[in-house]
Amino acid sequence: MARIETRTEPMVLNMGPHHPSMHGVLRLIVTLDGEDVVDCEPVIGYLHRGMEKIAENRTTVMYVPYVSRWDYAAGMFNEAVTVNAPEKLAGVAVPKRASYIRVIMLELNRIANHLLWFGPFLADVGAQTPFFYQFREREMIYDLWEAATGYRMVNNNYFRVGGVAADLPYGWVDKCLEFCDYFLPVVDEYEKLVTNNPIFRRRIEGIGTISREEAINWGLSGPMLRASGVKWDLRKVDHYESYDDFDWDVQWETAGDCLARYTVRMREMRESVKIIKQAIKGLPGGPYENLEAKRLIAGKKSEWDAFDYQYIGKKVSPTFKMPKGEIYARVESGKGELGIYLIGDDNVFPWRWKIRPADFNNLQILPHLLRGMKVADIVVILGSIDVIMGSVDR
């Protein structure tokens, strides 16, 4: 009987590019030896739209509507860093009320970001049901955004240099508190459904491990860094907005595997609810309806007309010029450190606008993590990183 020849040379496999609703248009050229991954080469750039060059040909006021398209799961963070950089460079003060409103919006976006990570990650592992569950909670956040900003997922166009576009509408604070009270038991439900599922644990526990030293050396940030034993959160480190006014904890793990990254994100959603509740309770001037009543009763000399309570703040003019100088501003987005390196030259347009997205840096470690793993682990490890290709490619 003739012996059947078997292939012994490595096989090259193309994965992607996929639809943007999953992990985005990312192509992986994977070299396989049987089921084992020998090498992986990510190919990026399919969603490049020249966002940095567009910024250098727009005023800050004109550019804010564009930025939701970097990371289309975290539009508020993009807007926050877009206005924080010129504010920092020009020394523009932000009223306390506007700062609290910003914090509320950012933490709602963190929850929405983690939910949109949670669903596809579970789908990658093989659990389809939670993928549909998470849209229920995201829809509630969309409704809150729509009431406050006029738009749902992206293009909120709410942040302004010096404040926010408008105050929170009548009844918004109560609706937001209702969502917070509803959401905490839902996170418990997710954990009960998923966390201790034996199939889920076997798929992600001990997979894609990153040591503390590797996480630092690769320049990782966000849950990727904190899951590897580095207690680093820019909300605590940089003291931006009003985060120092609230009592909350940085969530971190030491295992550095996919399970640790999952755990950090699930806990962060609870912390975000804690921050939102405190921000609403301490909102300078109280809910919009109370603030208006206090102003009316006290008249023009009311303290409620003071800078701290102005809901829109000292918004700059459309011809606002960025002074000469350079600055690096950063915020802790749902994926990690989102930064802007800005050079101003006393012009309405920035001379240089460099975007430092978190997921672009976090994605660099993917080939290192995949070598020696099985084919089935590729989507699990990629899913645990949490990438949005609009942000990676810019």
Swiss-Prot record:
Gene Ontology BP terms: photosynthesis, light reaction
Keyword Metal-binding: no
One term under GO cellular component: plasma membrane-derived thylakoid membrane
Domain of life: Bacteria
UniProt keyword annotations, A-Z: Membrane, NAD, NADP, Plastoquinone, Quinone, Thylakoid, Translocase, Transport
Function according to Swiss-Prot or TrEMBL: NDH-1 shuttles electrons from an unknown electron donor, via FMN and iron-sulfur (Fe-S) centers, to quinones in the respiratory and/or the photosynthetic chain. The immediate electron acceptor for the enzyme in this species is believed to be plastoquinone. Couples the redox reaction to proton translocation, and thus conserves the redox energy in a proton gradient. Cyanobacterial NDH-1 also plays a role in inorganic carbon-concentration.
Stored HAMAP family: NDH1_NuoD
Protein name listed in UniProt: NAD(P)H-quinone oxidoreductase subunit H
Organism this protein belongs to: Trichormus variabilis (strain ATCC 29413 / PCC 7937) (Anabaena variabilis)
Gene: ndhH
